[in-house]
Amino acid sequence: MTETIKGTCHCGNLTAALNTEKKPQDMWLRACQCDFCRSHNMRSLSDADGRLEISVQDKSQFNRYHFGLNMVDFLICKLCGNYIGAVQQVDGQLFGIINANLTENRGERFGEAEHRFYEEETGKERSARRKAVWTPATLRIVS
């Protein structure tokens, strides 16, 4: 049975829908320990066998933030400041994660997040990991 986990930034400019066969309590919730993710209290959610669609209602109020190795687009709403998730192109395909804290019930049904440390990974290792565990994604800009 397919479940759709929906999320939105505070003002609704950015939305996400993760289609998965997994039950929420069985999904692997991660808490990256980099400064950026910790400052946003990010708990990331993905399913390599699922499908993620992130939509932007007003592109003038949308920011793709980059830092570190500049490999990933961190998707931030300029209106409310929320970070809904991130995407990266790997081998011509887009992969993404969503912020479980911005999903319905604010991620309460997912349980505790596993703290993850990625600073020792090379860019190639990061791309391989993301391709393996992030969700195949589309980014749709409405206007």
What are these regions (language model features)?
Residues 1-8, 13-143:
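A short Gly-Trp-Pro
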